[in-house]
């Protein structure tokens, strides 16, 4: 069975890009039994480990950089991508960025969708962007969720939450926690910082961009 992964995404510094690049690089450590077709924009190639590019089980389908722009990416994803998958004989698609081709199911392509956040249903007012764009984003996410074969979420609380909100079959949802780069994770105690900010000896440092929808409480 040929599997495809859709990493055609933003080139801006973000959690989405980090997720996509790290996912690609981690594949290099696996002994793959099936052929995988990875779709991504040309500007991602400079950040992918050369070892994985040489993996004979992986074929890179390079797309033009303008597809990193959301509007063009959505048009491509919904009206071109699914037919391209069908012509390539792809039977299963992993869509890791909240959206998937809505007609994939009609083309007999199974879709695994990863949902990174329940924000549109829990705090719609905190979504970045204007009201019209956010409304369309939310509806496309809902349709993607309802048409996928398997939904992956990042926590058990997120699983329960989205299942209740969208009336989903709980058996259709799996939990896989997000990870972190090893270069950002280490155990260390800086006595000056602990004393200055009155931290306890054990604490969690959360590395994220300072935006309102990350719900950072000071």
Question: Model regions: which residues?
Answer:
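Carbohydrate transferase catalytic cores enriched for Leloir-type hexosyltransferases
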Residues: 1-218
